[in-house]
Amino acid sequence: MSGNESKIYDYFSKNLISWQKNFGRHDLPWQKNISPYRVWISEIMLQQTQVKTVLPYFERFMEKYPTLKDLSKSDLDDILKIWTGLGYYRRAEYIHKTSKIIKEKHNSIFPENYEEMVQLPGIGRSTAGAIMSIAFKKKYPILDGNVKRVIKRFFAIHDNNGSDKKLWKFSENLVPKNNNDIYTQAIMDLGATLCTKKNPTCGECPVRLKCKSYKY
């Protein structure tokens, strides 16, 4: 990594962290009483689903299954009843399977190990990265749809050159040494609230001055 590249990455992460503290979302239910379990459920529910849709489902889910231990005692049919209307029902099946595995192997305590985490049903690299970063405050990247869009626009990566392998490398380099939990929430929030798919609010973006897609 060159000195100029390092400065760009540092600029990006520092500005996002500062923006998140002042303007990011802080009132989402999974941002309160943060735990690996709550982050995991929220990340699974948010896959291909908007926050406003997930909110009531997450609240109901936590009321019925406040802990991983409670969830591990559940039947799949009960989980599916709560999930009705949220769609992508395989996610509920993965949650059920994973809760049983964690109960059996880890006594219903979420594993603080990335390699073990990505072996669990329904937990891919990005979901594991979010859990490791937000819940365990470890230095791991994520690459969900919103983050991909932010990275592609900031570095002006066109679709034909935007392979996941390349984007993962950018994502890894952007994660700061400190405050990585705040940074992770920040880059997700930026993609969800300002750097949206349609009609992005570029004028309010905290990294617009070095964004290669920003139109002055």
Predicted features and spans:
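Charged, often flexible domain-edge or linker segments that flank or initiate folded functional domains
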Residues: 1-3
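Catalytic cores of DNA base-excision repair glycosylases
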Residues: 6-9, 15-216
